[in-house]
Every structure is written in C-alpha cells, then in structure tokens.
Amino acid sequence: MSAPETQLAGFIARFTPDIAACGTEVLARLAARIPEAERLVYDNYNALAVGFGPDERASTVILSVAFYPRWVSLFFMQGAGLDDPHGILKGQGSTVRHVVLTQAGDLDRPEISTMIDQALVKAKKPLPVDGQGRLLIKSVSARQRPRRPGPDIG
C-alpha cells in the first residue's frame, strides 16, 4: 500500500464497520469505473470526502464520495445541471446534488449509473482520455466531529 492509501485506510477505519465497508467498496467501484480520475481526499470536520476529478484542484471535481457516521453519500458537484427524471438527487443549492447510498451496489442502479455517466459527460473539465489517476491527501482537519454515531447524534 502506498502512503496515501495507508493514510486513507486509517481515516476510513474510524467509521463503523458497515459504513467503512460500504464507502470503501463505493470508492473501489468508482476508481475501477474511472481509473484516469485523480482522487482527492479531504478528512474534514463533518465528513471524510474523496473527490474524483481530472486534476488535483478541488474546483474541477466531478463526483465525490462522503463518509458520514450513519451513511455514505455520492455527490454530483454540478448536479443541479443534470437531468433527474427519477427525482433521486437531493439538495436545493445552485450547484451540488447528492444521493445517499445504502450499499455499494446502489452504484449499479440504472438511475444512479446513468446520473454518473451524465455527470462525466457534462463535466466542466473532462477527465483525461487515458492514464492512471493518483490518490492525493489534500486536507486533514485538526478538529473533527465523531466518526461513529453516538446517542447525541440524531
């Protein structure tokens, strides 16, 4: 394992086994689907997020997987501009939308898979045609919310 992979595994290990397993499988499936994408890791205050984009800049991220204490979400960074005939995308902001994943297999649901394809096609900056993306640890917040649910998290 490379140093960034070891560091990411440590971040993920702080979540419950169910969340860690789901999120890890989602990351693996997306990395296999778009191997040319750079994977940018942000271990932030509210969540652990891994963005998939064409380069090392956060502003060009197309998709992002976020680990929360009780769920894993797939974010579409330009989701407001996507066609959503099934109404699966959540969010009301001017740009970003997301879908909560209950299991990694949700990526295979036609409505989610189609949304991923659409996001990749409509990306402001497309992914490289070939190559192998890197895993980059971009930010680790000193202060973080608990990564496992507790009685005070509702």
List where the protein language model places each region.
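Charge-dense, helix-prone N-terminal extensions
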Residues: 1-154
